[in-house]
A protein has these predicted regions:
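Alpha-helical segment of the N-proximal tetratricopeptide repeat
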Residues: 2-29
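Residue-level recognition of tetratricopeptide repeat
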Residues: 3, 37-40, 71
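Canonical positions in the second alpha-helix
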Residues: 30, 63-64
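Structural marker of alpha-solenoid helical repeat scaffolds
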Residues: 33-36, 50, 67
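Short cysteine-rich clusters marking metal-coordination/redox-active sites
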Residues: 113-116, 131-134, 172-175, 190-193
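Charged, low-complexity helical/coil segments in non-catalytic cytosolic or luminal regions
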Residues: 160, 164, 205-404
Length: 417
């Protein structure tokens, strides 16, 4: 064991036994002679744990993250210092408490006309709620773009690992009826008075509320026109009457990823020939061991948040303009059914990492041509932030040639897959 590693080891032992002053001294001595990256990270983290001074602790934690942006413990401690994460909310993802399967009382927003009391629905102009009875409409605007949330903070709490399992009991403020919906539904109409309701997810402690939404921009008539045009252009002959497209908001996760992909292997180096004439030595080839990093930066990697229609939704995702996502507002869901996620954010983030590694692997093998036996590691990759976004989709099925074809229409621009 190197001298600096011995000092760090002693620092850890003293920190664990409660002698923080001695731990600090060992860590500081290690930093005086340290010559490798890993030991610096360990020493500075020990220093952050050996002090109660908030400024000193912050300085040490920020130094750790400057060396290693993916250092989970340092990010957690810094989030606690910043007040973004409460120690009581931190969970062990491997031993989460069981979720209740009992029906839960759900609070919901109800949209009625202030003039006649009839129900109001969101209009596909993306700007207004319209009364179905008297036509009264009022416009609303939601400024800005959908906000991103800190991935690490969500992962440290139960919200990053939860998915809905319990049913939801709605109490309709219109007629007083109570009715039950499955946990995967975020909006619906009252089964008795037909009044639209939208779940207030901020009341559901272990679920993440959507960060953004791309509003529906097509009417039913426009969706039918897009469907007919697509069927005709693909030469599809339906065997029976095709059901009208059904509108829905489908959830997706988007992730911003950074950091680096670490790669190792053997680089081929050629030595220049030496001497002249008969004494000239031929060029020789040798292999040099390399351990290097390839920087990555990925914005808005989209992953389905629902297990339904995942394969076909993956084909539809590239047709959306994600930059058009608005901050989530329950009024967008008035009379438009929506699903909440049943794929947790933690599971979706793993799929995002797999996709990014696959994407960069192809690029790296094309760009780094002088390294043999290349091996890759995603340990240096970090998921920086995420959004839960609701996408507008029209759904239907077509029976043709003995096959059931699932059709999805992009509710933003009419693209069909």
């Amino acid at each position: 064991m190197n001298r600096d590693n011995e000092l760090v080891h002693e620092a850890w032992l003293n920190l664990k036994t409660g002698d923080r002053e001695l731990a600090r001294r060992y860590a500081e001595r290690a930093l005086l002679i340290v010559d490798d990256f890993e030991t610096k990270v360990k020493a500075y983290y020990i220093l952050s744990q050996a002090t109660d001074n908030p400024k000193e602790k912050r300085d040490h934690l920020e130094t750790v993250l400057a060396y290693d942006p993916a250092h989970a413990e340092a990010r957690r401690e810094l989030a606690i210092l910043d007040g973004k994460l409460k120690p009581a909310d931190i969970v062990n993802a491997d031993s989460l408490p069981a979720q209740s399967t009992d029906p839960q009382q759900a609070k919901a927003n109800r949209f009625t006309c202030p003039q006649c009391g009839a129900r109001r629905v969101f209009a596909p102009d993306g700007k207004s709620l319209l009364c179905e009875n008297c036509g009264y409409g009022d416009q609303f605007t939601v400024e800005g773009a959908a906000n991103e949330s800190d991935f690490f903070i969500a992962m440290a709490t139960a919200k990053g690992h939860r998915k809905p399992v319990a049913t939801q009991v709605f109490h309709c403020n219109g007629c007083g009826a109570e009715f039950v919906l499955a946990a995967g539904v975020i909006s619906s109409t009252c089964a008795y008075c037909d009044s639209p309701h939208v779940v207030r997810l901020d009341e559901s402690r272990d679920l993440l509320e959507p960060d953004g939404i791309i509003p529906h921009a097509l009417t039913l008539k426009q969706a039918i026109e897009k469907l007919v045009s697509w069927v005709e252009s693909h030469g599809i002959r339906p065997e029976k009457k095709v059901d009208q497209p059904r509108p829905v908001y489908l959830p997706i996760w988007t992730f911003d990823l950074g950091g680096s992909i670490n790669y190792s292997g053997e680089r081929i180096e050629l030595d220049e020939p030496e001497g002249f004439g008969w004494n000239r030595k031929p060029r020789t080839m040798r292999f040099v061991r390399v351990n290097e990093q390839y920087p990555i930066l990925v914005n808005d990697r989209a992953i389905p948040a629902s297990k339904k229609n995942t394969a076909i939704l993956n084909r539809l995702l590239p047709t959306f303009d994600m930059s058009a996502a608005k901050p989530y507002d329950t009024r967008y869901l008035a009379n438009w059914p929506a699903e909440i996620y049943d794929i947790t954010m933690s599971d979706a983030s793993l799929e995002a990492r797999v996709q990014v590694v696959r994407q960069y692997t192809d690029r790296m093998r094309l760009e780094i041509t002088n390294v043999e036996n290349m091996r890759l590691s995603s340990a240096g990759m970090t998921v920086e932030s995420f959004k839960l976004v609701l996408l507008p989709v029209w759904l239907t099925e077509i029976q043709s040639n003995g096959e059931l074809i699932h059709v999805l229409i992009n509710g933003q621009n009419g693209r069909v897959v």
